[in-house]
Amino acid sequence: MIPVVIEQTSRGERSYDIYSRLLKDRIIMLTGPVEDNMANSVIAQLLFLDAQDSTKDIYLYVNTPGGSVSAGLAIVDTMNFIKADVQTIVMGMAASMGTVIASSGAKGKRFMLPNAEYMIHQPMGGTGGGTQQTDMAIAAEHLLKTRNTLEKILAENSGQSMEKVHADAERDNWMSAHETLEYGFIDEIMANNSLN
C-alpha cells in the first residue's frame, strides 16, 4: 500500500501518493531490484525533473540489492546525460548494480547513511539448459565485456585502478559506510539531512 499525503492549498485539500509528493521536492526513490520497469520509472522522473529545471539538483535515494545490468546502465547513462546534478544518498544497501548507480552521482554529492552497506562483485550470467556450445561461448564473451564495462565505471567513480576493482570484485565484497568512503565510492557519510 502506498501512503497518501494530504496538503492544504488555497483551493482546499489536495492528496498525493507519497512518491508524487517527494517528486515535487526533486526526490526520486530507487528501491528494490533493478529491473526494466523500475529503471524506466526512474529515467522518466530524471528526465522530467531535468526538463523542469536543469539548474537544480535531483536527489536519488538508493536502497537496492542490484539486478539487471542493462536496466542499471540505462539509469547511469541518463544520470550522465541530463544537465542537472544528481545527488545520490544510499540508505540500507547499494549492492551489485546498485553500487554502479549510486557511485555515478555527481562528484562531491554522493552520500551514504551511517549504517548502510555497499557490495561490489563480478556480474553474474548464465545460459539456460540445452544451450549450444557456440551460444555458451558468445554468452561468456559478453559477460567478460560486461564485467570490463562495470569495472571501468567503478574505477572512474572511485579513483581506484581497474586492477584493484577487478581483484576486489572477484567475490561479494561488502563495505561499511566508512570503508565505502575510504574506497572513494562516496564523498560523505550523512548523520542527518544536511542536503542543500
Swiss-Prot record:
Similarity annotation: Belongs to the peptidase S14 family.
Location in the cell: Cytoplasm
Catalytic reaction list: Hydrolysis of proteins to small peptides in the presence of ATP and magnesium. alpha-casein is the usual test substrate. In the absence of ATP, only oligopeptides shorter than five residues are hydrolyzed (such as succinyl-Leu-Tyr-|-NHMec, and Leu-Tyr-Leu-|-Tyr-Trp, in which cleavage of the -Tyr-|-Leu- and -Tyr-|-Trp bonds also occurs)
Coiled coil: none
Annotated GO biological process: protein quality control for misfolded or incompletely synthesized proteins
Subunit composition and interactions: Fourteen ClpP subunits assemble into 2 heptameric rings which stack back to back to give a disk-like structure with a central cavity, resembling the structure of eukaryotic proteasomes.
Keyword entries, A-Z: Cytoplasm, Hydrolase, Protease, Serine protease
PROSITE patterns reported for this sequence: CLP_PROTEASE_HIS, CLP_PROTEASE_SER
Known function: Cleaves peptides in various proteins in a process that requires ATP hydrolysis. Has a chymotrypsin-like activity. Plays a major role in the degradation of misfolded proteins.
Name of the featured protein: ATP-dependent Clp protease proteolytic subunit
Organism field: Streptococcus pneumoniae (strain P1031)
Superkingdom of origin: Bacteria
Lineage: Bacteria, Bacillati, Bacillota, Bacilli, Lactobacillales
Catalytic EC class: hydrolase
Cleavable signal peptide: none
PANTHER family with a match to the protein in the record: ATP-DEPENDENT CLP PROTEASE PROTEOLYTIC SUBUNIT (PTHR10381:SF70)
EC annotation from Swiss-Prot or TrEMBL: 3.4.21.92
InterPro entries in alphabetical order: ClpP, ClpP/crotonase-like_dom_sf, ClpP/TepA, ClpP_His_AS, ClpP_Ser_AS
Alphabetical list of Gene3D superfamilies matching this protein: 2-enoyl-CoA Hydratase, Chain A, domain 1
Active-site residues per Swiss-Prot or TrEMBL entry: 96 (nucleophile), 121
GO cellular component terms given for this protein: cytoplasm; endopeptidase Clp complex
GO molecular function: ATP-dependent peptidase activity; ATPase binding; serine-type endopeptidase activity
Primary location class: cytoplasm
